[in-house]
Amino acid sequence: MPYYTKLGNLPRKRHVQFRRPDGALYSEELFGTEGFVGPTSTLYHIHPPTQVSGWKNLYTTKPEYVESGVMRMRHAKTADMKPKGDPVTGRIVLYGNADVEMGICTPEAAMDYHFKNGQGDECLFVHYGTGTLFTMFGTLKFGPKDYIVIPKGTIYQMVFDERPDDGSDNEKFAGKSKAEMPYGRFLCFETANASHILPPPRYMSKQTAQFLEHAPYCERDLRIPEPPLTFDEAGEFEVRIKARDSVHSYIYNYHPLDVVGWDGCYYPYCFNIDDFAPIVGQLHMPPPIHQTFEGHNFVICSFCPRMLDFHPEAIPIPYNHSNIDSDEILYYVEGDYGARRGIEIGSISLHPQGIPHGPHPGTVEKSLGKKYTNELAVMCDTFRPMFPTKAAVQIDDESYPESWRQDHHAPLENRNGAHQPKPSAAPATPDQA
C-alpha cells in the first residue's frame, strides 16, 4: 500500500510489552514482505498466531493451459457461465501465464471458512453483488465496480449479501435471477510470480509515496479497513492457505481475526472504478494513461466514461496497433465500446502480441464527430503470452478472429449517407481495371 495508517489499539512503541485486560501479553506479529525490507504492518493478536493444528492438503490450484501453440484473437463470452463453488473455490481461471492468472467467479455458496493466499496478491473486480470482506486488518464493504486489492498473506472471508427471492433486484444483476446468479460475480487477477499489485510508481512521489497531482486517483479515493476488527471467539475455525499451487487446511482453536490493533503500509483496500479520473487529450491517448495498478510483467487499466478527443479532425477511437511486446485482455463491464462489434457485457477479448488489431470495419467512420463515450472496461496487458484454459476454450467465439473481415458485416453508412461497398470476392484483373 502507498501510505501509512493504523486501526485499533496499539502500544506507544513497537516490540514493547502490550498487555490484555487480564494482564497477559498481546501477541505481536510483524507482517511484511521482501525479508524485512519491503512494506510491512505490525499486528497485535489476542492469541499467538502460531497456534494451529490439523494441517492437510485439500486440492491443487495449478491451472492447465491448452492450445499453447495456437496464436489467434480470442473472445470468451462469460455472461452465461454457471454458478460454482464459493468466492474462493468458484474461481475459474480463463487465461494466464507465469506472471498472472485471470478468471471469473460466480459463487453459488457462502464461505464457511477463512482463506489466506500465501502465493500471490489478488485484485478482484466486483461486477455484480454487494457484501463485506472480513479481514485480519478490519472490514471492507464492497459493491459493484469495486476493485478489491488483497495483499499476499491476508486472512479473509468474503461474504456476499443475500439476494431476495422475489426477483426484485434482477435488473441489478444483468437480468439474472437468484438461481442464475445467487450472490454476484467478480473478475479476479492473481499474481503467479510473487510480485505485488500496486499503483504505478510514476503516480507516486519518490520522497513521500504520496499520489502526485497528475495521478488519475489519490488517497481519498481508497477505502481502507474499518471496524469491526476483533473477533474474540473460541472453537474450531478452518483457515485454508493457498501455497505451492495447492490449498491446505489448518485449524485454529480461536477466531483467526483476533487482531486488536495494527499499523503499517501493508493491508487490503477498495477502489471504485467510477472514482478513476480519465485523462483526455486533443488526439487519441494511448492505453497507458488508463493504468490503475501493476505487478511484475503486467498492468491493469480502467477504461472509463469520458470526453473524447477534441481536435477538429480527431478520430476518437483507437488506431490500429501491434502488440509487439504484450498481450492485451479486455473485460467489458458496461456501455458501448465503439471500436468493437459483437462484444457484449461480460465479454473477454484477448489480442496476442505479434498480431495487429484495431477498430472493426466501419467503426472509424461511425465514430467521427462523437464527443463522449460511456464505455467501461477493465484491461490487463501482459508482457508474456497469455494462454487459455479448457474453460476459456469452451466459451470461445471461434468466429471472432474473422470479425475484422469487412465482408462479414452489413455495409455501414459513411458521413455522407453513402454505403461502403463490400470488397470484391477476388482482385480485379488488368482487363477489368
Kindly give the residue locations of the regions a language model identified:
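Jelly-roll (double-stranded beta-helix
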Residues: 1-433
